[in-house]
Amino acid sequence: MSSPALKLYLCEKDRILFENIKETFASSRIKVVYEDALVLIPSFQVLSPFKVIANLPYNISSPVIISLLTVCHTLPVKMVLMLQKEVAQRLVAESGDSNRGWLTAFLELMSKPKILTYVSKYDFTPVPEVESAVLVIDEIVLPEDLDRKLAVRILKTAFAGKRKKIKNSVFNYFKISAEKADEIATHCKIDLNDRAEDLKKEQWLCLIKYFKDNKII
């Protein structure tokens, strides 16, 4: 923290670690919070840009990322996260990769995630069962007019039927007529026979905006 204006918030749920951290890093510029990250994030409202650096418990890594990008009024400008290797690989999967999930597509709408490095399980004590990776989520910018809650709803629906074609997983699910589906698909340059994993960022943004502007759901 080279600038005196910077402040560091440390969140730890384990009582013993919390006490050790609080004692070790005692400073007016460091605030150590004894809390579950998923409980803290909704109440963590800051007006200035902030960054997140975390070694997350792997069982809550996705919920924490989702919360940071949907609940926070001010988005983090950058996140550096230690994740399970397979989770990190899924979050950077390109369009057309069957490894993509709805969170992959959601991240792509507002950021550029990339794997910085892999971390061997033998670098930890005790040795865990899984390998790890450091994921950098950079260039986080909320696209103009993007309704994040609507985006999550549409993406979750689309990827829930992962092997279904878009015309079934999205348009049929929301009871959109074939004629209207063709109109929307033409407008957003979407092939109705594509699957959710095939759609690119621009197509998702167009689809979400169309649904919002026309109050489809």
Ranges and model annotations:
Residues 1-153, 157, 217:
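Catalytic cores of RNA-modifying enzymes
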Residues 78, 94, 117, 180-181, ...:
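Alpha-helix boundary/capping detector
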Residues 133, 137-139, 144-180, 188-191, ...:
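An accessory alpha-helical subdomain
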Residues 31, 165, 176, 214-217:
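Generic macromolecular interface patches on structured domains
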Residues 26, 96-97, 175, 190, ...:
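Residue-level marker of structural boundaries
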Residues 69, 171, 212:
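Short, locally clustered residues in the helix-turn-helix/winged-helix DNA-binding domain
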Residues 23, 168, 183:
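Surface-exposed charge patches
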Residues 184-187, 201-217:
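SAM-dependent transferase fold signal centered on methyltransferase-like domains
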